[in-house]
Amino acid sequence: MRFSDSIEAGIYEPWRDKYMNYPELKHLLKTEEEAPSWGENDESKFVSVMDAQLEKVYAFHLEILKELNESVDWVKSKVSASQEPDGPPISKEEAIKLLERLDSCTETVKKLEKYTRLNLTGFFKIVKKHDKLYPGYSLRPVFQVRLRACPLGSVQFNPLLAEIFSLYNTLRDGLSAPSNSVQVKPKHEHNVDYNSSMYRRRTFRFWVHPDNVMEVKTYIMRHLPVLYYSGKQGFDKDQNGVSGILDPISTCLYLDNSNFDLYSQNLERSEQAYSLRLHWYGKLTPKTDIIVERMVRQGSTLSHSEDRFTIREKKVRELLSGRYDFRKVEDDHSTTASDQKKKLIEDVEQLIVDNHLQPVLRSVYTRTAFQIPGDDEVRINLDSDWVMIREDSLDIERPCRDPEDWHRHDIDDADFPYKHLRKGEYSRFPYSVLEIRECVRYDEDEPLWISELRNSHLISEIDGFSKYEHGVAILFEKYVSLLPMWVFSMDQDIRKDLQEVYSHPEGSAGSRNVYIKRRNQRVLKQNMTPEPSQPSPLVNRLKANEMHPVSEEPEDNREVYRNEHGDHFNFRSIPGLLKPSTYGSFKHHGKTFVTPPHIKKPEIPLRVSGPIKVEAKVWLANERTFLKWLHVVVLLGSLALALYNSAGERLGQAFGVVYTLLAIFIGFYAWKLHAKRSQMIKSRSPAPMTDYWGPLIVGTALAISLIVNMSFALKDAVYQNLIEPDRLLVKLFT
């Protein structure tokens, strides 16, 4: 899709006149002319029009932002006044109106963010097109100067959103209406042992397209507060969130050896695959505390055990060389280190020395964390502006990092997007990464709002995704022999069509969403109260998009039908005789199995209850089947050609023509079958691909032709007195 069509499709109609006029600027560039001429007058006119468009967009941006701040400040004043000792309390009706106003502010923030991003992208594209058409009039430096005066690209909506949803949670907690959000637990429940056998830990990772990041943030903020990080150290949470850092820059330095053994172990899902990284927040200074994290992945799942300890920046070199003195750490911190921590440090040192580990990859991203302080039941991380940078010294002649040092100093003070780096030293990830960590009891379901988010059109789940594995696969491709599966789908658009996701019952997540919709309806009916409450946007979409219902025929009627028609035989049951489970089908024919009362028939087939994922081997199996059929065609065609050219015999020529027609029929059948299965794979249809009648018909036709050919040949031999009729059976069986 061209950008002119994209900006037209993304326009919010009430603000149409406030957008940049991209077609007009494109027309001024004379893109429609074959050999356009460009002079000073054309340049001056284009720059003046573009500057006026930029000022118009920025003025409207400031106007809407001012209105938003005024609305939020007004709600904040109401809430603050009610919290005073002698302040008037907020009634339930007033609280609902304030919540509606905050919801309106949230929707406006989403529209304003999309408006700003769309216009800013348009300006960058038109400047790039200008410099490409007329390189003698470089406009990019001038545009960068104008952007400093109209800083559309440096606008941060997260502080405003955090304030909105802080008020939102305060007002919602004062209402008695139930909520699907994770509730804030009392202090005496914060010390729950989530590592016990009663709880299960699950981790999900998703890719989020830049167009959906703001909507994902606003949806999560309705249910979880944003974590603030203290200015001293990132992993210490600021409980009051007043003077903290909202979206800190997080840096991870991964360690591996020249053979990338840790990468291979994690990619192959070994039983105990280690990962080792150095982690810190903000700029790296001599006083920065470095978090050493050792992770051990258990099998093929994303679950892993994680151990960590903290050291100062000046001690990292000693740790990597195996000369780290644990007793000095005790003196520096004036604490008595436990034996467990001492053993952890010794194990990490042993892991580094035995495997010759060294820093190879740096991962830098902006992290937005959502979690109730002190509660590990649900934690969500949203990592944006992710850049992967080589930190290795594998190339002796041109090392990216000084082999005598443990990190690159040219990156420590640099900022995103690190344009000073050479091509091939870094790679920018095009999406944001969403990670959901939940720890729930085995007898409980996950919160409904998380189920809605996981199955929505806003995010795309990637099984087994790892930042380290992706970074190595992109930047060190020539050093490794295996690549993760998701690398091959990087060029695909991860955005999903809203109508297809929520309306199509046979889509990738359609069947599961039908189930979620019905479960949500049951919960809403159970929790329904007279007080109005604001439903989540995803529930509204589920209600607005009607789906095809699943058959609700009573089980008794189906049993009656089976009892009445189960003993009848018809030709439609012939394919069933060819299945491998024929013996089991006849053995249990006519029997009725009684299931326990707590087991119910699933509303949807289990084989389509989750996302249908097509692996590469499915395509290869279809191609292999087609080639097998072509092999049969070639053999049959060769036989037909040999018979047709057999010493001028009319019988051989006749059957040569018959075999040729049969080969053409088989080739046409194989082609149609291959095309049909390819279409089913592309559409991810859950229908079976088995074809019973095709091989049966082809085999029968071939057998009949061979029998007829043999009978005619024998008859001709008898007719020519080559075989005596009374000795025919003797000739056949000797």
From Swiss-Prot:
Residue ranges crossing the lipid bilayer per the database entry: 625-645, 651-671, 694-714
Membrane topology: Multi-pass membrane protein
GO CC terms in record: endoplasmic reticulum; fungal-type vacuole membrane; vacuolar transporter chaperone complex
Phosphoserine modifications at: S181
Topology Vacuolar: residue spans: 646-650, 715-734
Family matches, as InterPro entries: DUF202, SPX_dom, VTC_Complex_Subunit, VTC_domain, VTC_sf
Swiss-Prot/TrEMBL keywords: Chaperone, Membrane, Phosphoprotein, Transmembrane, Transmembrane helix, Vacuole
Site (Important for inositol polyphosphate binding): Y22, K26
Topological domains annotated Cytoplasmic: 1-624, 672-693
Places the protein is found: Vacuole membrane
Residues recorded with modification Phosphothreonine: T529
GO terms for biological process, alphabetical: energy reserve metabolic process; polyphosphate biosynthetic process; polyphosphate import into vacuole; vacuolar transport
SPX domain span: 1-144
Residue ranges, annotated region (Important for inositol polyphosphate binding): 125-132
Pfam families in UniProt: DUF202 (PF02656), VTC (PF09359)
Superkingdom of the organism of origin: Eukaryota
Residues carrying Phosphotyrosine: Y583
Similarity comment: family membership: Belongs to the VTC2/3 family.
Domain notes: The SPX domain has very high affinity for inositol polyphosphates. SPX domains may integrate inositol pyrophosphates (PP-InsP)-dependent signaling to adapt cytosolic phosphate concentrations to different metabolic situations.
Function: Accessory subunit of the vacuolar transporter chaperone (VTC) complex. The VTC complex acts as a vacuolar polyphosphate polymerase that catalyzes the synthesis of inorganic polyphosphate (polyP) via transfer of phosphate from ATP to a growing polyP chain, releasing ADP. VTC exposes its catalytic domain vtc4 to the cytosol, where the growing polyP chain winds through a tunnel-shaped pocket, integrating cytoplasmic polymer synthesis with polyP membrane translocation.
Quaternary data: The VTC core complex is an integral membrane heterooligomer composed of at least the catalytic subunit vtc4 and the accessory subunits vtc1 and vtc2. vtc1 is a small membrane protein without hydrophilic domain. Vtc2 and vtc4 are related and have 2 hydrophilic domains that face the cytosol, an N-terminal SPX domain and the central core domain. The central core in vtc4 is the catalytic domain.
Protein name per Swiss-Prot or TrEMBL: Vacuolar transporter chaperone complex subunit 2
Record organism: Schizosaccharomyces pombe (strain 972 / ATCC 24843) (Fission yeast)
Higher taxonomy: Eukaryota, Fungi, Dikarya, Ascomycota, Taphrinomycotina
Gene name for this UniProt entry: vtc2
